[in-house]
Amino acid sequence: NIGCITGVYNISASYVLVEGVFSNTQNVSPYRGAGRPEATYIIERMIDIAAEKLGFDKVELRRRNLIRPEQMPFKTGLVFTYDSGDFPGLLITALNAANWAGFDDRRMASKSRSRIRGFGIANPIEIAGGPERKPHSEFARVTVSPDGSVVLVSGSSDSGQGHATVFAQILSSKLGVDPTAVSLIAGDTREAPNGTGTFGSRTVAAAGTSIVKCAEILIKTMQEPAAEVLESTIDEISFEDGYYRVQKSNLSISFIDL
């Protein structure tokens, strides 16, 4: 996590000395030791302090020092190499969404009501699909019942992230079934014998990939019965938008009907 301490800024070398302090009396609020938020706080706070001491706009100071797309892949001074990213473009998008240009007017309006309004800015970066260099696998199993309902068993459990919706959409796009026909089983060790879990922005990358592979195996497995029903050969069968089709003909059958 210390590798994130240089953030998304053009810093090719750095020297870092970290001192940890244990306390049960946080001056703001308790937070779990995730690592990236702490690293982000350090670099972003340093930029705010530098901007104040230099009499420089804190947004402009960030913008001037962001890693640019043409510098990718960018090797940071600590641990990581960023493979891609448009950090300047993302900053502009965020500023527009937050109406940065209109902040002074909002601050004055708040001041007239004896209120204090502030504007915080930070550019965090997160490992997705980690751990870095060795992403863990994820379990998935897809079964289809005779009535056309689809049951997905996942080793990655939902704790508020909305897995059921995302997973159903993935299967829907691959198999051409209605998302409402997909039911999810997770957190049941009798059904899912193993699983890595939900953390570190990995679920869609890892579990989603496993689900896609399950769907692809299922589609390929069903090609032979599709060929039999359509009185064709496997080589002539293609699958698209939820239908098995005989090439160069109008013969087809939906995945659900099959």
Question: Predicted segment positions?
Answer:
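Glycine-rich loop/linker segments at domain edges
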Residues: 1-46, 127-137, 205, 253-255
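C-terminal, non-catalytic interaction/recognition modules in large multi-subunit enzymes and RNPs
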Residues: 141-151, 234-258
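Beta-strand segments within the central parallel beta-sheet cores of soluble alpha/beta enzyme folds
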Residues: 58-67, 105-121, 153-155, 179-188, ...
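Catalytic phosphate/nucleotide-handling subdomain of diverse soluble enzymes
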Residues: 128-192, 197-202, 206-211, 215-219
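Glycine-rich and small/hydrophobic secondary-structure elements
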Residues: 28-53, 74-99, 195-229, 250-258
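Helix-loop-helix junctions that connect adjacent transmembrane helices in secondary transporters/permeases
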Residues: 66-149, 169
